[in-house]
Every structure is written in structure tokens, then in C-alpha cells.
């Protein structure tokens, strides 16, 4: 991205944020003059000054620096996933498949709770659940808290996102919706496909044919088959002989959602209710671009780009260099909430949430690889990934009126059990190379073909209890809180790798290697003296198990110290233990030996926030807190994982420490109308032992790992405006302008960070200097129409921090996110006495590209990964019965 473009967009967002409050002030400050026809207006009366709280939205009522995302906000943006909707919030950015960055900090510094309970992640490489799993139809609101409160988990860095599922409504209904969309780089274009088999694979449900065959389950290590050729032959032939990738036209994206509620009013104020919702979505995306890896000095290791084919000496088959990937995504989600209320003071609620996503991937990379210098190589991968998260929570709320000054006691309790899983029942990789006679042949080395099976299971059990006591003491409002938490988490991962390799003494002919894999690995060529034998090439570090236990307690108080000054202070105590068991990888000293990581530590975490209402509808907040950031269980294991999106290997670090963070916040807030506000805030954070994702040598190439830097700081400014103006102010005599309103929602965040790591400094990994959002549109509640133009900007950020290896530091990998320009419109029609909501949306109007790159000491720059993002056109229809 050019500096001019960055500065221009940042200036646009900043000017919108700073000038809109002036317009609002002018509108507020211009009351109509009294007229003679209004006798009361010209009467002389005594001056009466009334001071009171005008609280137009929930954001002001909170005791913390926070933003609230409501159902109305989601309707304005037209977002289908909660991650997309959160990207519109001040200081938030969404990276990859729904991972939230708050104030430019990486997803590791973000916490997510659902109805008060933490959630496990179905991603082995991530510590938090991806928000693209959550359709907006299942979420009622989201509170984004940027200052820490003692009732929440102590792992807090950038912010906490508290999601709430839809509550039991006040009336019964049945709602249905459908959508269809097309993306310019994918829909109707040729995609890459392979036969997953099974009757339900077209909706993302695989049959047993993708699982590890029963024959191999007898002994997955194959060790007992070593002296039994017949058993070894049977094991090889039991694997599915599906390898090839074919081309076919991509379908458009589509989706359906259904929700309904039932209410039953019983006698004596007892009320039963239930809410259910289900959502299904299908999406297919093509990605075509370049991938490269570089040496420290900028020399090329792997070149997967069109330029690689130019170096093939004029061979006619040296075409199509670069990478191509097609991913089909099937999402099936369901929510059930059932509750009972007793006289409005007591409530029991059972909530069950199921989020399931399946991805079928086909990848072809063609170019120059360091494993075959000077030869064009074609690498292909078939991948099937099933992710699922299931959360079950039983909760209660009980209110008791007490005969004392603090006269209202509320008791909230919850018991939650959640599971997350990620299964890769079938992943195949194989390589061909273009040899000097212009023929592609399967590579002869041990890496010519591999078949993987892996499974990850994550269980989370949590019990929470909270007490809230409200009342008046000495004519001052006071709220006391206390509570506790017990959480247990277990994670298990297991993987198996297999490869067909030539039997002892067998040389595979060049002619056989020139055929497709289905012929090369046909049953006739497996076992005995035929050619290939199945080998187990599993690494000892492909297995790990981990546990974590947290016990916590907190107390806090919110007190009106003097008139217009509220102070909230508290402290949380957390005691935790993390245990990870794995093995030393092959190729390293002590390969196969067990290795354990144990982190046991306790913390006192103080927090305080002061809110001063120094003027009508204005207030100033100051906040301080101490928080922590633990390594994830995955990050403490040295097991190797493959990042399917970037095709990069990743390994944890058993020597990681817990990071400690000091947080300071100052924010001015002005509420000048219903759902209208302006804010300007300053923030500062200091880190001890911050955990950073690094780019470093792994095996024969480069990959990702984690390490503690020495210290880091982050400072920044954020501003926000939410402003609505009736259009008839501009043209009161034009009928079309009647009842129409123009709204502007804009925010901008500038932040600067510095990490001290060994002998050099840099920005925090994942932190963007500039973030900005702009929503400009109009709506007519009477005509039930609305249109919104949305802009989302995220500045460059370090994707992977380079580390010092020997006497040289590897260059950082820098990510350049696209500028996203979207247009959303909706209209409600009445047909046959029923309302129908019709929506249209255009996403990524600019057709931006995605890029990650490295800059070298000699002034050169290399693209690590780059591809074009298409423009998406969507239509939706929904109705309620």
C-alpha cells in the first residue's frame, strides 16, 4: 500500500470523526427563537437548573471503557457473521477466519466469553474460538470491553468480547430466511475438486471412507506388520486410492436460516419459553496467486510464481506456475435456549449451541522448490477438515429484596460444559517434477507422497458464581460484587503420517512415475515385490496431551464517591496450572524422549475505573488494571502443525513464560442524542515477557514458533462518532426527504508499539498503526428502507516476527490487509398481509488484493504470499410468521 493512499484514507476517517461532533453541537446549540404566537415562550420565569442523567445507550451505563454492538448495528451493516460485524467497532480488526484484534493487538490478547463462559477453540493453532463460526442470527448483542473488570478472566490484553445468545422473547414467532451470492474470482469459474465420497459429503458430512482404515487400526504404527508381508500389503491396499484433482465449475454461495420461539404463561407468574435457531451456509472460494520463501539476504528458496516457469529452459510443459486453491466450506449451526421465569425475580435457563464447519480443499503449487534445484515441481494437496464446537450451559438468576440499606441481592450462577474438535481424517500430498525430457514424473524421494490423519479434542468445564448487592448508603449509590470461578480444560492431539516408499531393493521405473497416482499406487503395485510398501513416518512429537486448571475469586465495588463521580475498584485472584506432555521431534538431540512443560503460578490482579460526569451528557473515564497473558496449551507443545491457509509449519515452545500487562485508559464521552455519541480516548500498555509469534528455521526450511520478548509498550488514540441527522432539515419541502435520516458511524485508531527483543526493537507482532471504519447511509423507518456504505481499513502489521539466528536477524513478515469498501441496502415489502425483508450487498467493491512480504537489508522486497480477493454480490430474503 502506498503512503499516499494510507495517509489519504486515514485523513478521511479522522476528518469525519472530528467534524461530525461539531455538526452535532451546532444542531444542539441552535434552538428556535420564541415567537409572539407562543405566549408561554415570552413569559418571564425563574431560572430552574435540572441536573440529571441522560442515558441513551448501554455504553454509557457500563462502568468500563466499552463498545456495544446491538441488533440494530448488525442490521445496518448487513453482516452475516459476528466477526464481520465486530470489524466495524472502534479499534477492532478481524484477521483471517474471524480472529479479532483489539487496538491492533493480536488475537492472543483478545478474550471471548459466551453468556459469561469461556469457549474452547476447534483450531489447533489458535487460542480463541474463530468468530466466523458465529452467525449473527444466533447472537443478540456483543459487549466489547477495553478496560478490565474483576468479574472477568484475568487473561486480558487488548479487550474482552462478551457475546450473548438470544434470550427468550416475549412473543412466539417463526422466521425463515435465504440468501444467494456470487464472487467474481470464484462463482462460475473453474475450481479444483476431488472425490470425497459418501452420500453426505456435499453437505460437509464425510463417511467412514475418509477415516483411518480398520485394517491399519489393528496397529497404526505398522510395527507388528514388519515381518508379515501379507498384512503390510493389506494395510497399503486398505487406503483409498483417490489422489487426483479435477476441474469443475463453481456453484454460487447460498444459505438458509430458520428460527422460532414459543411462550407459555402459567399461573402465579410462572412463564416458560423456548427459542431455537438453525443456520446452513455453503461457500466456495478460489485463490490464485504467488508464494515464495526467502533466505536471510533475500535469495529465493522456493519460488511459486509465474516467473518460475520462465527459468525452465523453454520446456513446453513449464506452464501454470503459481498456486491455485479451491476451498468449499459447509457451515451448519444450531442454537436452543429454554427457560423458566418465576415472578420476574428468578430465572433458570438452559442453552445449547452447536457450531460446525467443514472445509474441503484442493491445492496445486507449481514452481521452483529448494528440494529440486533448477527443476519445476508441482505439489498437490487434498484436504478435508471438520471443525465443531458444542457449548452447553445451565444458568440461573435469582433476585432477593433485603430489609437493609443494600436492599437488592442478585445471585447468578452457571455450569458450562463445552467441547471443540478438529478432525483431519484425510489429507494427501504428493509431488511431480518436470524432468529434462519435458515429462512430469513423481519425485523419487521419500517426500514424494504422504497421507495424514489427525484429530484434536478440547474439553472445557466451568463453574461460576456471582453475587451483586445494590443499594444506598448515605444517599450514595453503591454496588458490591463478589464471585468465583473453577475451570478445567483438557486437550489431546494425535496424528499419523504414512508414505508409500519403494520396497527394499526395488527401483521404480521412470515410466511408472509418469502416470497419475491412482495408477502408480494401484493395488497391483503395492506389496510383495511389486514396487511400493506403506511406511509409518509419524514423528514422536505428533502426539501431545495437555491440561489446565484455573481457580479464581474476586471482589469489587462501584461507589458514587461524590456527586457525579463514580469509582469502580476490585481485585481478582487467579491460581492456574498448565501441563503439556509431548516428545522431542526426529532430527533433534534426544529424539523420541518425552518432554513436559509445566506452568504453575498465581496472581493478584487489581483494577480501578473512575467515571466523572463533569457536564450534562458528558463524562470522563480513567481506568487502570493489571492483567496477564498465558501461553496456550498448543503453544507449549513442540508438536508440528500445518497452517492450511498459508501452507506453513508451526511449532510451540515449552519454555514460554506468562506475560504480565499494565493497562491505562482515559476516555472522554459525549452523549448528545438517542443512540448518538462521540468519544476520544487515550490508552497505554506495558508488557513484561510478551509472547510473540516468530518466523524461524524449522527442519530444512522456515516456519513459525513462539518466544517471549523482553518487554514491550503500546500507546494510542482512538476516536468515534455515531451521528444521525433528519434529512428534512436540509429540504423540508421535499416529500421524499420526509422521515429520512442520514447517519454517520466512524471511528479511527492510531497506535504505536515497541518491542525490546535482544538487541533490536520493532512493533508488536499483529499490531497495525492505523485502524479505521466508516459507515455512511440513510434510513427511513416509515418506508422501512435503509442503505449503508461501509469502509474498513487496517494498516500494515507484522504477521510473523523474525528472530536472530546466528549473527543475523531474519526479516519480519509484514501483512498488508485490503481496504474493504462495501454497500448494503434493505427494503421491507408487504405482500398478502405479510412482511418480507429483501437485502442486497456488494462486498470488496475495490477488488483489493491480499499480500504478505519481507524487506531485506539490501533494500530488496519479496512477496511471501499474494492473491486477489474478488467482489461479492449477495441477495437475501426473510420473513416472519
Regions found by a protein language model. Give the residues of each.
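A beta-strand signature from Gram-negative outer-membrane beta-barrel systems
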Residues: 121, 133-177, 733
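Transmembrane beta-barrel wall of Gram-negative outer-membrane proteins
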Residues: 217-363, 388-390, 606-609
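Outer-membrane beta-barrel signature, preferentially recognizing the C-terminal barrel domain
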Residues: 374-395, 538-551, 599, 617, ...
Amino acid at each position: 500500500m502506498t503512503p499516499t493512499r494510507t495517509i489519504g484514507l486515514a485523513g478521511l476517517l479522522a476528518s469525519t470523526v472530528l467534524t461530525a461532533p461539531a455538526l452535532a453541537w451546532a444542531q444542539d446549540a441552535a434552538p428556535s427563537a420564541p415567537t409572539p404566537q407562543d405566549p408561554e415562550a415570552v413569559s418571564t420565569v425563574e431560572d430552574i437548573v435540572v441536573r440529571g442523567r441522560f442515558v441513551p445507550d448501554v455504553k454509557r451505563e457500563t462502568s468500563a471503557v466499552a463498545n456495544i454492538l446491538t441488533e440494530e448495528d448488525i442490521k445496518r451493516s448487513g453482516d452475516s457473521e459476528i466477526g464481520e460485524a465486530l470489524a466495524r467497532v472502534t479499534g477492532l480488526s478481524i484477521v483471517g477466519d474471524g480472529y479479532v484484534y483489539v487496538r491492533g493487538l493480536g488475537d492472543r490478547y483478545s478474550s471471548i466469553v459466551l453468556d459469561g463462559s469461556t469457549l474452547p477453540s476447534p483450531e489447533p493453532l489458535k487460542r480463541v474460538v474463530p468468530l466466523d463460526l458465529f452467525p449473527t442470527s444466533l447472537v443478540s448483542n456483543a459487549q466489547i470491553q477495553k478496560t478490565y473488570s474483576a468479574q472477568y478472566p484475568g487473561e486480558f490484553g487488548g479487550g474482552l468480547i462478551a457475546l450473548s445468545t438470544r434470550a427468550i422473547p416475549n412473543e412466539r414467532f417463526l422466521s425463515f430466511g435465504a440468501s444467494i451470492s456470487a464472487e467474481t474470482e470464484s462463482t462460475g469459474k473453474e475450481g479444483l475438486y476431488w472425490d470425497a465420497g459418501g452420500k453426505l459429503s456435499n453437505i460437509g458430512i464425510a463417511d467412514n471412507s475418509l477415516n483411518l482404515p480398520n485394517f491399519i487400526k489393528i496397529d497404526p504404527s505398522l510395527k507388528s506388520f514388519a515381518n508379515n508381508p501379507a498384512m503390510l500389503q493389506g494395510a497399503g491396499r486398505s487406503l483409498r486410492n483417490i489422489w487426483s484433482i479435477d476441474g469443475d465449475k463453481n456453484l454460487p454461495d447460498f444459505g438458509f436460516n430458520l428460527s422460532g420461539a414459543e411462550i407459555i404463561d402459567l399461573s402465579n407468574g410462572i412463564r416458560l419459553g423456548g427459542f431455537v435457531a438453525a443456520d446452513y451456509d455453503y461457500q466456495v472460494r478460489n485463490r490464485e496467486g504467488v508464494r515464495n520463501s526467502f533466505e536471510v539476504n533475500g535469495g529465493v528458496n522456493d519460488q511459486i510464481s509465474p516467473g518460475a516457469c520462465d527459468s525452465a529452459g523453454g520446456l513446453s510443459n513449464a506452464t501454470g506456475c503459481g498456486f491455485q486453491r479451491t476451498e468449499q466450506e459447509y457451515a451448519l449451526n444450531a442454537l436452543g435456549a429454554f427457560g423458566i421465569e418465576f415472578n420476574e425475580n428468578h430465572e433458570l435457563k438452559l442453552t445449547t449451541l452447536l457450531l460446525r464447519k467443514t472445509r474441503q480443499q484442493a491445492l496445486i503449487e507449481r514452481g521452483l522448490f529448494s528440494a529440486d534445484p533448477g527443476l519445476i515441481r508441482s505439489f498437490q494437496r487434498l484436504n478435508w477438515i471438520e471443525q465443531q464446537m458444542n457449548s452447553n450451559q445451565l444458568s440461573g438468576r435469582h433476585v432477593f429484596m433485603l430489609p437493609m440499606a443494600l436492599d437488592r441481592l442478585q445471585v447468578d450462577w452457571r455450569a458450562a460444559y463445552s467441547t471443540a474438535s478438529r478432525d483431519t481424517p484425510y489429507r494427501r500430498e504428493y509431488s511431480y517434477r518436470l524432468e529434462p525430457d519435458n515429462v512430469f514424473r513423481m519425485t523419487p524421494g521419500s517426500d514424494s507422497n504422504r497421507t495424514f490423519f489427525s484429530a484434536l479434542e478440547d474439553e472445557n468445564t466451568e463453574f461460576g458464581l456471582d453475587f451483586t448487592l445494590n443499594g444506598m448508603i448515605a444517599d450514595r449509590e453503591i454496588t458490591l460484587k463478589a464471585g468465583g470461578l473453577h475451570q478445567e480444560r483438557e486437550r489431546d492431539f494425535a496424528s499419523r503420517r504414512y508414505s508409500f516408499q519403494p520396497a527394499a531393493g526395488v527401483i521404480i521405473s521412470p515410466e511408472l512415475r509418469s502416470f497419475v497416482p491412482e495408477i502408480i499406487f494401484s493395488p497391483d503395485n503395492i506389496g510383495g515385490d511389486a514396487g511400493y510398501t506403506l511406511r509409518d513416518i509419524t514423528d514422536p512429537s505428533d502426539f501431545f496431551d495437555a491440561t489446565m486448571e484455573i481457580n479464581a475469586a474476586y471482589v469489587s465495588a462501584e461507589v458514587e464517591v461524590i456527586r457525579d463521580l463514580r469509582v469502580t475498584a476490585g481485585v481478582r485472584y487467579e491460581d492456574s496450572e498448565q501441563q503439556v506432555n509431548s516428545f522431542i521431534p526426529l532430527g533433534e538431540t534426544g529424539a523420541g524422549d518425552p518432554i513436559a512443560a509445566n506452568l504453575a503460578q498465581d496472581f493478584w490482579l487489581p483494577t480501578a475505573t473512575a467515571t466523572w460526569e463533569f457536564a450534562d451528557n458528558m463524562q470522563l473515564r480513567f481506568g487502570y488494571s493489571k492483567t496477564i497473558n498465558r501461553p496456550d496449551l498448543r503453544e507449549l507443545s513442540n508438536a508440528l502443525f500445518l497452517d492450511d491457509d498459508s501452507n506453513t509449519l508451526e511449532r510451540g515452545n515449552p519454555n514460554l513464560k506468562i506475560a504480565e500487562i499494565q493497562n491505562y485508559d482515559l476516555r472522554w464521552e459525549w452523549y448528545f442524542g438517542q443512540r448518538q455519541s462521540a468519544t476520544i480516548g487515550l490508552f497505554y500498555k506495558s508488557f513484561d515477557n510478551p509472547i510473540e509469534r516468530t518466523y524461524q528455521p524449522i527442519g530444512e526450511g522456515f516456519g513459525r514458533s513462539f518466544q517471549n520478548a523482553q518487554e514491550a509498550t503500546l500507546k494510542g488514540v482512538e476516536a468515534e462518532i455515531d451521528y444521525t441527522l433528519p434529512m428534512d432539515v436540509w429540504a423540508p419541502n421535499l416529500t421524499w426527504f420526509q422521515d429520512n435520516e442520514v447517519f454517520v458511524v466512524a471511528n479511527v485508531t492510531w497506535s504505536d508499539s515497541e518491542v525490546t527483543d535482544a538487541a533490536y526493537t520493532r512493533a508488536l507482532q499483529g499490531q497495525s498503526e492505523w485502524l479505521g471504519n466508516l459507515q455512511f447511509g440513510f434510513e427511513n423507518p416509515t418506508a422501512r428502507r435503509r442503505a449503508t456504505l461501509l469502509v474498513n481499513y487496517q494498516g500494515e502489521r507484522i504477521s510473523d516476527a523474525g528472530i536472530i539466528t546466528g549473527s543475523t536477524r531474519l526479516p519480519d513478515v509484514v501483512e498488508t490487509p485490503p481496504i474493504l469498501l462495501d454497500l448494503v441496502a434493505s427494503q421491507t415489502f408487504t405482500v398478502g398481509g405479510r412482511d418480507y425483508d429483501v437485502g442486497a450487498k456488494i462486498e470488496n467493491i475495490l477488488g483489493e488484493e491480499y499480500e504478505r512480504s519481507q524487506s531485506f537489508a539490501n533494500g530488496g522486497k519479496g512477496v511471501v504470499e499474494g492473491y486477489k480477493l474478488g467482489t461479492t454480490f449477495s441477495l437475501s430474503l426473510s420473513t416472519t410468521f
